[in-house]
């Protein structure tokens, strides 16, 4: 554009010079020189302007390239940021998934713990029920044992009472005696007169022997047969009592029983008649 302007000015000047042909040559030369100088200066200015414009265009191009590079870098940075954001989102999502999975595992473990707790509570309830049953069973067993012990105590008390009575009877000496209104029946059966003192030292206690013989005779006929009389027979080492009882099953007869040194009772005649 500047070149065209310079050319136009030059052409104008040339036309002006031609129209002013009346001027002297020196003036023309001077004017021509000035014009040429001015044209040269303008041409230089135009060149300088063109150079500046070119430099400016280059700078613009460089700036444009720099801007493009900068934009490219910015795009790369944005892409990298987006990728990083995507990676972070992926990481966050993965972390969230892991957290959710962990929470699910925790919830599952919590549920499992709750189930185990329920199982433990159920097991504890069963154990308590078993303990209650065992306690009740032990209570029943203890009650049964106490009852058995009470029964044993009663039995022992009865045995002790019997033993006490027997001991009292054994320890307390009772001299042999005949029955009330006795009829000599046993006395008539014996032969001879053995040493009564020696015989009593070898024979059982008189009262015990009489009680045992009475029990045996009453059991024989099922009656209460009154005691009648006694006698001692035998010799040294072989003594025995002879007892007679009024036979209530067959009135007028007597039941004869003997008791030896070992305390053995024998009914020798259930219905003796003299």
Curated annotation (Swiss-Prot):
Subcellular location as annotated: Cell membrane
Q: Where is this region: Disordered?
A: 18-169
Keywords of the record = Cell membrane, Lipoprotein, Membrane, Palmitate, Signal
Q: How does it sit in the membrane?
A: Lipid-anchor
Q: Where is the composition biased (Low complexity)?
A: 91-169
Q: Give the positions of lipid attachment, kind N-palmitoyl cysteine.
A: 18
The cellular component terms of Gene Ontology attached to this UniProt record, alphabetical and capped at eight, are: plasma membrane
| Top-rank taxon | Bacteria
Where are the S-diacylglycerol cysteine lipid anchors?
Answer: 18
Biased amino acid composition, Basic and acidic residues: 25-76
Signal peptide positions on this chain: 1-17
Q: What is this protein called?
A: Uncharacterized lipoprotein SSP0535
Organism this protein belongs to: Staphylococcus saprophyticus subsp. saprophyticus (strain ATCC 15305 / DSM 20229 / NCIMB 8711 / NCTC 7292 / S-41)
Its taxonomic placement starts with:
Bacteria, Bacillati, Bacillota, Bacilli, Bacillales
């Amino acid at each position: 554009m500047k070149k065209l302007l310079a050319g136009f000015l030059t052409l104008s000047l040339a036309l002006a010079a031609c129209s002013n042909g009346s001027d002297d040559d020196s003036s023309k030369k001077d004017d021509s020189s000035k014009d040429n100088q001015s044209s040269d200066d303008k041409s230089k200015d135009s060149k300088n302007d063109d150079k500046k414009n070119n430099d400016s265009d280059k700078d613009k191009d460089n700036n444009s390239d720099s801007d493009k590079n900068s934009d490219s870098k910015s795009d790369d940075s944005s892409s990298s940021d987006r990728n990083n954001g995507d990676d972070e989102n992926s990481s966050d999502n993965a972390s969230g998934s892991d957290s959710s999975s962990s929470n699910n595992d925790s919830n599952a473990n919590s549920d499992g713990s709750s189930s185990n707790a329920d199982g433990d509570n159920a097991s504890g309830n069963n154990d308590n029920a078993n303990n209650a049953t065992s306690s009740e069973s032990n209570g029943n067993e203890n009650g049964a044992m106490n009852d058995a012990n009470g029964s044993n105590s009663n039995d022992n008390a009865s045995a002790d009472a019997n033993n006490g009575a027997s001991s009292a009877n054994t320890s307390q000496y009772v001299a042999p005696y005949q029955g009330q209104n006795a009829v000599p029946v046993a006395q008539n059966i014996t032969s001879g007169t053995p040493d009564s003192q020696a015989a009593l030292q070898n024979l059982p206690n008189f009262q015990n022997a009489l009680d045992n013989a009475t029990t045996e005779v009453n059991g024989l006929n099922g009656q209460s047969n009154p005691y009648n009389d006694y006698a001692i027979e035998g010799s040294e080492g072989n003594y025995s009592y002879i007892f007679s009882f009024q036979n209530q099953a067959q009135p007028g007869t007597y039941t004869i029983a003997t008791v030896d040194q070992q305390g053995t009772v024998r009914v020798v005649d259930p219905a003796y008649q003299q």
